[in-house]
């Protein structure tokens, strides 16, 4: 069986496992107060060009999204997000569970536009009864998006400008950030993201770590943020496990280097799909590739390949997703191409 169902099929990069083994018997303080967490935080600040950033390590993406959004918003506020965004569709109502509504915006290939934020906010405040409604309190985007697409630097700057105008904190979900940063089609750097956002996170779970996400508040974290992390069940007692992983990922540019494999394998698959005449659902420059398959072909392929159902295309076709990762082997791509 070939596995292309997600980008976390593998365990962790061998360098991380080796470092965890080497440090296993060290006696260290808990909850992210150890020397490895401190070292990882400094390396992340340096990589972001943001020396005063507040950095925290959380265990997973959904906990991270819910904790950040819940910590930033007032009780009467909601978060603006693409109607196709992860927090809108694939987190089992985790944001609503914190007491905050997801306020959806129209999306084009997974991306929202600055104009959509402006339209929403001005329409909201133009309604004389807005005190009876959920206030827009922050903006959520992801990079790459749920569809593997990327914001350009110009688009990111425009969204940032609108967010500042209306005093809406901008939160960027970076679960797959490594893959976005190394795409040959991007002009966005980690420093650009730190400059344009109020908070973002660097994904580890999908980019080489066993688990974990590094949250970066570019200015200042909400007061008592760590306590709120604890309330959300996202604080790891053995915080060293996250610190060691991110310290390793941000040593010798490992995070960037291993991310390139996902792009190289995905682009080879993309070229093969195009050469074989398959219809791409959209043009993704990252590790997620979406293709329209005849239902008969989907059933046939599913006997030997694990892939992700995305959506119904029509009565005879389905959109599926192939996802590559830092650990995808080129020979598995070749085997998949043969089956196609």
Where are these regions (language model features)?
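Conserved N-terminal alpha-helix of the aminotransferase class I/II PLP-enzyme fold
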Residues: 13-61, 83-88, 94
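Active-site C-terminal subdomain of aminotransferase-like
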Residues: 108, 135, 142, 150, ...
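Catalytic PLP-binding core of fold-type I/II PLP enzymes
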Residues: 151-183
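PLP-dependent aminotransferase-class I/II
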Residues: 99-137, 141-144, 151-158
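Conserved C-terminal alpha-helix-loop-beta "cap" of PLP-dependent enzymes
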Residues: 74-76, 267, 272-340
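Conserved PLP-anchoring active-site segment centered on the Schiff-base-forming lysine
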Residues: 71-89, 118
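Conserved core of the PLP fold type I
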Residues: 54-73, 103-110
């Amino acid at each position: 069986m070939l596995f292309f169902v997600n980008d976390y099929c593998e365990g962790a990069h061998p360098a991380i496992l080796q470092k965890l083994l080497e440090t296993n018997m060290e006696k260290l303080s808990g909850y992210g107060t150890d020397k490895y967490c401190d070292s990882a935080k400094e390396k992340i600040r340096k990589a972001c060009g943001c020396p005063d950033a507040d950095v925290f390590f959380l265990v997973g993406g959904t906990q991270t999204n819910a904790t950040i959004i819940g910590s930033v918003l007032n009780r009467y506020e909601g978060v603006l997000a693409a109607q196709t965004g992860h927090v809108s569709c694939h987190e089992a109502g985790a944001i609503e569970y914190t007491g905050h509504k997801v306020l959806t915006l129209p999306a084009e290939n997974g991306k929202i536009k600055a104009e959509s934020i402006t339209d929403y906010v001005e329409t909201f405040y133009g309604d004389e009864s807005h005190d009876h409604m959920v206030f827009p309190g922050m903006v959520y985007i992801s990079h790459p998006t749920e569809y593997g697409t990327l914001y350009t630097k110009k688009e990111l700057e425009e969204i940032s400008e609108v967010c500042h105008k209306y005093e809406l904190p901008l939160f960027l979900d970076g679960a797959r950030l490594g893959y976005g940063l190394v795409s040959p089609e991007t002009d966005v750097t980690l420093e650009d993201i730190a400059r344009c956002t109020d908070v973002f996170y660097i994904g580890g779970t999908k980019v080489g770590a066993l688990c974990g996400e590094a949250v970066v508040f570019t200015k200042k974290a909400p007061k008592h943020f760590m306590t709120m992390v604890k309330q959300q069940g996202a604080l790891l007692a053995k915080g060293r496990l996250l610190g060691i992983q991110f310290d390793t990922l941000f040593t010798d540019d490992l995070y960037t280097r291993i991310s390139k494999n996902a792009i190289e394998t995905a682009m080879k698959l993309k070229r093969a799909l195009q050469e074989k005449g398959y219809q791409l659902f959209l043009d993704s420059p990252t590790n997620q590739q979406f293709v329209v398959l005849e239902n008969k072909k989907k059933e046939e392929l599913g006997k030997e390949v694990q892939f992700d159902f995305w959506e119904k295309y029509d009565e005879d076709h389905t959109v599926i997703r192939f996802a590559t990762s830092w650990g995808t082997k080129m020979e598995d791509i070749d085997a998949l191409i043969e089956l196609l």
